[in-house]
């Protein structure tokens, strides 16, 4: 009997566990529910040693434009979320289950896999700068120095800051360094919709690499899980997830653009750029806030995004924005579960979106994967992380 290698096995087991129990670790789950699902999980784990190898991920179901190809780079990264690449070709991957992973890459293949740390509180975001790996962990930002040369024996992390909000609802944080050398850190709203301190929640902030000189960059942002800087204008662009419980088709997720510090994007008063909040929007018209560049659709859960500047894809893709849509969880008919691209003029104007990769959502609303982040590579390929399948995919192009 052939058994799966441990990382791949537990990735598949996680998917089986979710499918059987309907459980996924999110804020607000009761203690009784956790206990019940953990008992079921324990039963599954006891049977793990005797389970045969399970089917590989159905990657051939993914539809792409002509000439594009997708393959599984790794299925040994459970709950894979944010990605960051070092100049040495080491891919760092955050997760929702306490681990941070490193994949050594060569010629588009994984040559080694490492666990950098474990037991952290939702270390979803990772960023690399000057030889160090920065990791978000809800209220903390940690730094692992000289990490590229210590993958097998990672150093003890340095606490960059431990003063971020402790709330776990929208508490996971995508992080990235901007062209100004600052570390950008979002602080999501601790709720579906609520009026909290707007200097503490619903914003993007930035700080020096050592954690000093923190300042708010933009407000009125419910929950951004992806941002990047335009390769020509160097302006900050970011996704934002719209509120829930207003219906299947409102409000839209947004792609926003912040060319200067201090802009307000409306939350909790206005959603999707044109939908007043029924509770908080009465005295705050949507016209008072910065509208989105693109309305991405309701409940698609737009997460990671990057500008594509590589040369492998056709020229029409250069400077496009790729966005990972994690997919809906509270809509009567599921949407998202795909990767889209946003096309703009060279200055970022006239933006519109097109579907790039789809097939994680199958007919009958069966889901086998959920894109979480995207990462362009130096060779021009594009990586996609998937926290549901515990995988990273690699997209390439060759002339049809």
List PLM regions with ranges.
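Beta-propeller domain segments
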Residues: 56-64, 172, 189-192, 206-212, ...
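Beta-strand-rich domains and repeat architectures in extracellular enzymes and scaffolds
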Residues: 71-95, 301-306, 323
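Surface loop/turn motifs at the tips and blade-to-blade linkers of beta-strand repeat domains
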Residues: 73-77, 115-119, 160-167, 216-220, ...
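Beta-rich catalytic cores
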Residues: 79, 119-122, 129, 171, ...
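Conserved beta-propeller blade signature
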Residues: 90-93, 132-135, 182-186, 235-239, ...
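A short loop-to-beta-strand structural motif that recurs across blades of beta-propeller domains
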Residues: 99-101, 140-142, 203-205, 254, ...
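Asp-box/WD-like beta-propeller blade repeats and closely related beta-sheet repeat scaffolds
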Residues: 140-178
């Amino acid at each position: 009997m052939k058994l799966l290698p441990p990382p791949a096995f537990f990735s598949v087991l996680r998917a089986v566990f979710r499918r059987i129990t309907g459980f996924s670790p999110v804020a607000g789950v009761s203690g009784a529910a956790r206990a019940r699902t953990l008992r079921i999980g324990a039963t599954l784990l006891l049977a793990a040693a005797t389970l045969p190898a399970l089917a590989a991920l159905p990657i051939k179901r993914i539809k792409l434009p002509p000439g594009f190809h997708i393959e599984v780079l790794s299925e040994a990264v459970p709950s894979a979320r944010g990605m960051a690449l070092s100049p040495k070709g080491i891919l760092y991957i955050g997760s929702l289950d306490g681990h941070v992973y490193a994949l050594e890459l060569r010629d588009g293949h994984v040559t080694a896999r490492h666990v950098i740390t474990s037991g952290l509180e939702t270390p979803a975001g990772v960023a690399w700068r000057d030889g160090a790996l920065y990791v978000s962990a809800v209220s903390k930002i940690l730094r692992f120095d000289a990490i590229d040369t210590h993958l097998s024996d990672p150093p003890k992390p340095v606490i960059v800051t431990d003063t971020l909000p402790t709330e776990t609802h929208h508490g996971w944080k995508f992080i990235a360094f901007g062209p100004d050398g600052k570390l950008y850190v979002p602080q999501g709203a601790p709720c579906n919709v609520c009026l909290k301190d707007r200097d503490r929640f619903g914003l993007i902030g930035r700080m020096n690499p050592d954690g000093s000189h923190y300042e708010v960059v933009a407000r009125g942002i419910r929950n951004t899980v992806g941002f990047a800087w335009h390769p020509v204008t160097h302006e900050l662009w970011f996704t934002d997830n719209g509120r829930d419980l207003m219906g299947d088709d409102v409000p839209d997720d947004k792609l926003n653009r912040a060319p200067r510090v201090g802009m307000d994007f409306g939350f909790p008063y206005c959603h999707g750029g044109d939908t007043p909040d029924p509770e908080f929007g009465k005295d705050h018209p949507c016209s008072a806030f910065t509208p989105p560049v693109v309305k991405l659709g309701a409940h698609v859960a737009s997460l990671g995004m990057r500008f594509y500047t590589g040369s492998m894809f056709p020229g029409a893709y250069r400077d496009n924005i790729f966005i990972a849509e994690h997919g809906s969880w509270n809509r009567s008919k599921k949407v998202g579960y795909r990767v889209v691209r946003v096309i703009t003029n060279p200055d970022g104007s006239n933006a519109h979106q097109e579907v790039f990769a789809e097939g994680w959502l199958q007919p009958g609303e069966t889901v086998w994967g959920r894109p979480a982040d995207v990462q362009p590579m130096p060779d021009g390929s594009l990586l996609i992380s998937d926290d549901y399948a515990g995988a990273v995919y690699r997209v390439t192009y060759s002339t049809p």
